[in-house]
């Protein structure tokens, strides 16, 4: 999960 504006991304 990536932090920031796209937490839903791996």
Swiss-Prot record:
Top-level taxon in the UniProt lineage: Eukaryota
One GO-annotated biological process of the protein: regulation of blood pressure
Principal localisation: secreted
Any single GO CC term annotated in Swiss-Prot or TrEMBL for this entry: nematocyst
Keywords from the UniProt entry: Hypotensive agent, Nematocyst, Secreted
Transmembrane regions listed in the UniProt entry: none
Subcellular location: Secreted; Nematocyst
Keyword flag Secreted: yes
Family: Belongs to the bradykinin-potentiating peptide family.
Function comment: Inhibits the angiotensin-converting enzyme (ACE) (IC(50)=2.03 uM). May act as an indirect hypotensive agent. In vivo, is not toxic and does not induce lesions and microscopic abnormalitie in rat liver.
Name of this protein: Angiotensin-converting enzyme inhibitory peptide
């Amino acid at each position: 999960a990536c932090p920031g504006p796209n937490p839903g991304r791996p």
